[in-house]
Amino acid sequence: MVVNNPNNWHWVDKNCIGWAKEYFKQKLVGVEAGSVKDKKYAKIKSVSSIEGDCEVNQRKGKVISLFDLKITVLIEGHVDSKDGSALPFEGSINVPEVAFDSEASSYQFDISIFKETSELSEAKPLIRSELLPKLRQIFQQFGKDLLATHGNDIQVPESQVKSNYTRGNQKSSFTEIKDSASKPKKNALPSSTSTSAPVSSTNKVPQNGSGNSTSIYLEPTFNVPSSELYETFLDKQRILAWTRSAQFFNSGPKLETKEKFELFGGNVISELVSCEKDKKLVFHWKLKDWSAPFNSTIEMTFHESQEFHETKLQVKWTGIPVGEEDRVRANFEEYYVRSIKLTFGFGAVL
């Protein structure tokens, strides 16, 4: 990144969200609670979603970081059953805010066990006592490593700075950064000056398919068997009931793979890509005002807990134009989740 900022006087910023995603994939995946040979064991399987903003900034020689992220990781593990056999489980941990000013004690964690039973619930105390403290440490270190990696990219070198004031700020900033950053590791992320571009804030939907897309993760719960919820997204009469307005182009009673349809007066254009009965649905989905190249993908996985009489709907949503995440999330929660619960009585509405 080329910097044209005499004496480092003016505000300069750098978008580091791509680097942040790679950082957390490298740091979080594989973090464990207990040992695989223990009666209870859990580990982070993958990073499902990272949403938000991440930048490094400087003005008058002072380097700071600004980030506010929502992180969801997928977990797996096992607990011993009453007969001594291992019961495997999968789930998720949602962290609604990892911010530049967060304290180690302020992080909130929402732990979810898919297809939960009273026996599988015994994994939660282990996750809280052994896994979450490790996550707190990683989140606290992130801001320091972010500055150590990218702080130099947004400043003119100290040797070219004539102002004693900004040079003093610059020197003190990097003394603090060096003292707080983690020691370099063999597989540490590279410090690239070309892959992160300066921030350009806009509320407009990107007008090209250049890859300016992001993802979100949702996990609503419905008080209904997975088979009923699954049919609610496929049966055309049910779709008409919870959307109040839908247009189908095939005459069959249910959606079929590769079938396109429109919802909410044509404001949503969708297509059923694939289905696995009572387990998974995949849709292409776009808003009418998105430009042609954009077509997001919704992957819905149904996790039924017969003991707790509920189904968790795991929603992985990719290919959303940058800047549209909040709009898409709000629309799904209001016009899908809330509407389905109210129409069919599939759960409480807050």
Swiss-Prot record:
Positions with biased composition (Polar residues): 158-175, 203-212
GO terms of biological process kind: protein folding; protein import into nucleus
Biased segments, Low complexity type: 190-202
CDD domains: SRPBCC_Aha1
Stated induction or repression of this protein's expression: By heat shock.
GO molecular function: ATPase activator activity; protein-folding chaperone binding
Cross-referenced Pfam families: Aha1_N, AHSA1
Location within or outside the cell: Cytoplasm
Keywords tagged on the record: Chaperone, Cytoplasm, Stress response
Record annotation: effect of changing K60A: Decreased activation of Hsp90 ATPase activity with a small reduction in Hsp90 binding affinity
Location of the region described as Disordered in the Swiss-Prot/TrEMBL record: 158-212
UniProt effect for mutating D53K: Decreases activation of Hsp90 ATPase activity and substantially reduces Hsp90 binding affinity
Effect of K62A: Decreased activation of Hsp90 ATPase activity with a small reduction in Hsp90 binding affinity
Ranges in a coiled coil: none
Gene Ontology CC terms: cytoplasm; cytosol; nucleus
Main function: Co-chaperone that binds to the molecular chaperone HSP82 and stimulates its ATPase activity. Binding to HSP82 promotes a conformational switch in the catalytic loop of HSP82, facilitating the interaction of the catalytic 'Arg-380' with ATP in the N-terminal nucleotide-binding domain. Although not essential, it confers thermotolerance when intracellular levels of HSP82 are limiting.
Family: Belongs to the AHA1 family.
Other information: Present with 13939 molecules/cell in log phase SD medium.
Subunit (UniProt): Monomer. Interacts with HSP82.
Protein name: Hsp90 co-chaperone AHA1
Species in which this protein is naturally found: Saccharomyces cerevisiae (strain ATCC 204508 / S288c) (Baker's yeast)
Lineage: Eukaryota, Fungi, Dikarya, Ascomycota, Saccharomycotina
